[in-house]
From Swiss-Prot:
The lineage of its organism: Bacteria, Pseudomonadati, Pseudomonadota, Gammaproteobacteria, Enterobacterales. This is Ion-translocating oxidoreductase complex subunit A. NCBIfam families: PRK05151.1, rnfA. It is found in: Cell inner membrane. Belongs to the NqrDE/RnfAE family. The complex is composed of six subunits: RnfA, RnfB, RnfC, RnfD, RnfE and RnfG. Its EC number is 7.-.-.-. It is an enzyme of class 7 (translocase). The keyword Transmembrane helix applies. InterPro entries: Ion_transpt_RnfA/RsxA, NqrDE/RnfAE, NqrDE/RnfAE_oxidrdctase. It is a multi-pass membrane protein. GO terms for cellular component: plasma membrane. One of its GO terms (biological process) is electron transport chain. It comes from Erwinia tasmaniensis (strain DSM 17950 / CFBP 7177 / CIP 109463 / NCPPB 4357 / Et1/99). The chain crosses the membrane at residues 5-25, 47-67, 72-92, 102-122, 134-154, 171-191. The gene is rnfA.
Length: 193
C-alpha cells in the first residue's frame, strides 16, 4: 500500500507530466484561460489517461507480448487512445452538452495529446504491474489536471492585473508556467534516494 501511495505522490507532484516531463503543453496553454474549461478538460483527460493506461497495459500483456508484436506498441496504443477518446466524447456529449460545447475542438485533440500517449509508454518502460499501471495513469492525469486548474486560476487573475504591455498574453503565461515549474521542483525533496 505504501508503494502505491509513493507512486501516486511521486507522479502527481515530483514527476508531473506537464511541469517536469513537458508533456501535454498544448492543452495546458490552450485550455487554461478559463477555470471552467480547465476543470472540464482536466476531468476528460483524467478519464482518458486512466482508461487508456489500463487498456494499453492489457493490450501489451495479452496481445503484443504473447504474439511477439512489441514493435507495434505505439500504433496499438494510438488506436486504443482513439477509441477511448471517442467513447469519452460520446459520454460528454450525452451527459453535459454545455461542457461539450465549451471544450470544442480540444476534446478530439485529446487523441493527439502527447501526455495521453506518453503515460502508457512510460508505464511499459518502467515495467509496471497492472495495478501500478492503473495508479500511474490515474496519478499522472490528476497531476495534469491539478497543474491545469492551478494555472487557469492564475491566468484568470492575471487578466485583472496590471501587466506591462510586452508581457501581456502568452509571454506572462509562459513566465507563470516557469514559476509554477520551479515551485513544483520543491516537491523533489519529498523523495529520498
Amino acid at each position: 500500500m505504501t508503494e502505491y501511495l509513493l507512486l501516486f505522490i511521486g507522479t502527481v507532484l515530483v514527476n508531473n507530466f506537464v511541469l517536469v516531463k513537458f508533456l501535454g503543453l498544448c492543452p495546458f496553454m490552450g485550455v487554461s484561460k478559463k477555470l471552467e474549461t480547465a476543470i472540464g478538460m482536466g476531468l476528460a483527460t483524467t478519464f482518458v489517461i486512466t482508461l487508456a493506461s489500463i487498456c494499453a497495459w492489457l493490450v501489451n500483456h495479452l496481445i503484443l507480448l504473447p504474439l511477439d508484436l512489441v514493435y507495434l506498441r505505439t500504433m496499438a496504443y494510438i488506436l486504443v487512445i482513439a477509441v477511448v477518446v471517442q467513447f469519452t466524447e460520446m459520454v460528454v456529449r450525452k451527459t453535459s452538452p454545455d461542457l461539450y460545447r465549451l471544450l470544442g475542438i480540444f476534446l478530439p485533440l485529446i487523441t493527439t495529446n502527447c501526455a495521453v500517449l506518453g503515460v502508457p509508454l512510460l508505464s511499459v518502460n518502467l515495467n509496471h504491474t497492472f495495478m501500478q499501471a492503473a495508479i500511474y495513469g490515474f496519478s499522472a492525469s490528476i497531476g495534469f489536471s491539478l497543474v491545469m486548474v492551478l494555472f487557469a486560476g492564475v491566468r484568470e487573475r492575471l487578466v485583472l492585473a496590471d501587466v506591462p504591455a510586452p508581457f501581456k498574453g502568452s509571454s506572462i503565461a509562459l513566465v507563470t508556467a516557469g514559476l509554477m515549474a520551479l515551485a513544483f521542483m520543491g516537491f523533489a525533496g519529498l523523495v529520498k534516494f
